[in-house]
C-alpha cells in the first residue's frame, strides 16, 4: 500500500482506543481533514479474553519489567487483529494502553509499538500522542477535547455544552462552539472529574465475581452512605483547579472506604461518588453548559445517569441523542487526532491539559521504517 499521507483534503482515518476499563479495543473510521469532520464510517470492537484482561490488570501502575512486556504483547496482537479488518483506512491513530500516568514526576506510559503495527498492517501509524504534551508541562490528558470541539461543530451546536466520558475515569470537556479553533483561549476547558466506572468494576469483581454492574442493578438495590460519600469528596483532587488528570489507580483507596458496607450499599455509594465528582467538576466551567452529552460505558448505567441528572442543572443525555456513537467516540477521537498530527496541527492546549502553549505531539511510523517525531509548538 502507498504509505504517503496526503497533505490536503479529507483522509479516511482509523482510530483505536483501549481504555482504563480494560474491556477491549474499540476501532472506528472518521473522514476528516483534521479540522472539520466530513463523516463517520465503520467501527468494530474486540473484547479482551479473561486471560488477556488479567495480564493487563497485573501491569497497571508499572513502568517496566516482565509484566509490562507481557501487556505490550497483548495490546499489539489484539490491535493487529481488529485493525486489519479496515482495509479502507489511509492512516491509523493508535493510542495504546495506558499503564501508568504521573505527568509531574515520572511521565506517562502507553504500551504498544506503533512502528511494529505500521509494518504489520502496512499503514502509516500515528502514536505516542501524550509524551510531547507532558514534556511541555501538560498533564498529557485528556486528549479527546479537540475532537469534541469538532463534534460540537458537526452537530451544529451554537451554545456552550459539555461532553462527559464515563470510562474507568471520568473526563469532562466544556466546549464553546462560538470560537473558530479549539486552541483559542476560552474555546475549551477539559479535565478528569474523578473516578467513574473503575472503582465499581473493581469492587463487583472482587466481591461478586462480576465484570461490572450491568444496568446499575446492584447499585439500585443499595443505599448511598452519605458519611462515606462526603469523606471521599474531601480528597484534595476535587478542589484542584483544572486542567488536571488522573491515573486509573489514583483513587484505588476509595474502595477501602466502603469496605464495611454491604455489597449493594458499597456499589451505590461508589456510583454516587462518580456522579458527585462530575457535579463538582461542572462548577469549574465558565458557565453552566446547555447540555451534558455522555459517552463511555457509564451512560448505559441508568442509576448513574439518574444521579447525574439529579445533581446537574442542565439536561444530561447520551450522545446518541445528537447522532453520535457513545461506544466509539474515543476511538474516533484518535482517528481525528492522527490526521491533526499528520497535518502539523495542535492536539492540546493550555485549556485542555495545562500545557504551556498549543502543541501537537505524536510520532508517525511508516511501514518498514522507524518512527519520526511529528510535533508542533
UniProtKB/Swiss-Prot annotation:
Q: Which UniProt keywords apply?
A: ATP-binding, Carbohydrate metabolism, Kinase, Nucleotide-binding, Transferase
Q: What is the E.C. number? A: 2.7.1.170
Q: Which Pfam families match?
A: AnmK
Q: Name one GO biological process term.
A: peptidoglycan turnover
Q: What class of enzyme is it?
A: transferase
**What pathway or pathways are given for this protein in its record?**
Amino-sugar metabolism; 1,6-anhydro-N-acetylmuramate degradation; Cell wall biogenesis; peptidoglycan recycling
Catalysed reactions, as listed in the record: 1,6-anhydro-N-acetyl-beta-muramate + ATP + H2O = N-acetyl-D-muramate 6-phosphate + ADP + H(+)
Q: Which SUPFAM superfamilies match?
A: Actin-like ATPase domain
MF GO annotations: ATP binding; kinase activity; phosphotransferase activity, alcohol group as acceptor
What is the protein's known function? Catalyzes the specific phosphorylation of 1,6-anhydro-N-acetylmuramic acid (anhMurNAc) with the simultaneous cleavage of the 1,6-anhydro ring, generating MurNAc-6-P. Is required for the utilization of anhMurNAc either imported from the medium or derived from its own cell wall murein, and thus plays a role in cell wall recycling.
Q: What is this protein called?
A: Anhydro-N-acetylmuramic acid kinase
Give the source species: Roseobacter denitrificans (strain ATCC 33942 / OCh 114) (Erythrobacter sp. (strain OCh 114))
